[in-house]
């Protein structure tokens, strides 16, 4: 049996180009474009966290947590039930558990975060629901792609039956669904009797691009549950699960507790969400991130793999070209062979963005 040290070495030696950051020269400052998860916490969020010290009610009984429903109902223009959670995976999986029974299935894109990057958590939290994988350019689903999956599933007791659809907006490749595109899927979901979930880890970036109301691209388009992301956009550790059918939240409150996600000092999570909502800070930070991505996209030219509609830029780059960028101090992830991913954030330094744009143009 391998020793812990041997196991650790094996893990470190495994080929993990998707997540490993090759070291840049030690004498150069790192300019990070690998993930908006690494972005700084916005000062106004920090202030809100500190202000929450003055409250002492535990779990979700404090006035900040209790105000979330009202604040988000006002934002979306309809009655909602909102639950804070400490991660996007938690938000996604609790939403899916509310929409899909253990014996059911969820249609999602082959490259969806719930399929590739949540470590089996969707299956765990739903107690065994199956993920049905669909195709689509830029990780976007269409009604036709979803129907192709649904039509291939016979109404047979021996086969898992679909119960929900999950899309990501903005997608894992930085593409944005318009309200009309979401509504087309929403119509399909209603017609088929399926729940409809939106993974909104970068929901703010999508809304900033669209210039529409949050309502237009969610409940007005048929979405039942939204994982409203804040961590990538200026928060520290708070995401918000928004149910447009408040009845869905009733049992989810118990699932959140059972899953160990009901933090005793939850007021600090609520404080972050509320700070992001104040004066539309969530949109201001998303617009800043999107604008910086647009600068990189302009430099990318023919190297662009996907249209840049949010804050992610995917470029064609040979290993030598990627190494040349890293030698100049830029940090980013390798993606597929011959591809790199650059992610901007609300706090991306404009000088760094300009330098990277120049370096890309010079390749």
Show which residues each predicted segment covers.
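N-terminal intrinsically disordered, low-complexity tails enriched in polar/charged
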Residues: 3-7, 25-34
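Conserved PLP-enzyme active-site core in the AAT-like
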Residues: 28-329, 333-339, 343-348, 352, ...
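Intrinsically disordered, low-complexity regions enriched in polar/acidic and amide residues
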Residues: 9-11, 46
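A cross-taxon signal for low-complexity, glycine/charged-rich
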Residues: 1-5, 12-13, 18, 23
């Amino acid at each position: 049996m391998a020793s812990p040290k041997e196991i650790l070495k094996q893990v470190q030696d495994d080929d993990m180009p998707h997540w490993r950051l090759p070291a840049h020269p030690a004498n150069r400052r790192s300019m990070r474009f690998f993930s908006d998860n690494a972005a700084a916490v916005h000062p106004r969020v920090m202030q809100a966290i500190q202000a929450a010290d003055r409250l002492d009610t535990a779990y979700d009984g404090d006035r900040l947590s209790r105000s979330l429903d009202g604040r988000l109902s006002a934002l979306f223009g309809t009655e909602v039930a909102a639950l804070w959670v400490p991660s996007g995976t938690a938000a996604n999986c609790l939403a899916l558990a509310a929409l899909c029974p253990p014996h059911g299935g969820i249609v999602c894109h082959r490259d969806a975060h719930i399929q590739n990057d949540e470590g089996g958590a969707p299956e765990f939290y739903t107690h065994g629901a199956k993920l049905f994988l669909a195709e689509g350019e830029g990780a976007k689903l269409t009604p036709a792609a979803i129907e192709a999956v649904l039509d291939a599933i016979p109404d047979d007791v021996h086969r898992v039956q679909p119960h929900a659809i999950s899309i990501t907006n903005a997608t894992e490749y930085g593409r944005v669904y318009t309200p009309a595109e979401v509504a087309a899927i929403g119509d399909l979901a209603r017609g088929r009797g399926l729940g409809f979930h939106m993974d909104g880890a970068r929901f703010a970036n999508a809304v900033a691009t669209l210039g529409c109301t949050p309502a237009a691209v969610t409940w007005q388009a048929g979405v039942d549950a939204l994982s409203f992301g804040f961590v990538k956009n200026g928060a520290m550790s708070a995401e918000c699960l928004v149910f447009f059918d408040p009845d869905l939240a009733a049992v989810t409150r118990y699932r959140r507790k059972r899953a160990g996600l009901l933090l005793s000092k939850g007021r600090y999570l609520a404080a972050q969400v509320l700070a992001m909502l104040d004066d539309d800070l969530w949109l201001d930070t998303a617009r800043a991130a999107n604008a910086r991505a647009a600068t990189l996209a302009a430099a990318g030219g023919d190297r662009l793999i996907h249209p840049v509609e949010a804050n992610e830029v995917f470029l064609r780059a040979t290993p030598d070209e990627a190494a040349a960028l890293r030698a100049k101090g830029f940090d980013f992830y390798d993606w597929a062979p011959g591809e790199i991913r650059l992610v901007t954030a609300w706090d991306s330094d404009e000088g760094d963005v300009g330098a990277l744009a120049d370096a890309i143009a010079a390749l």
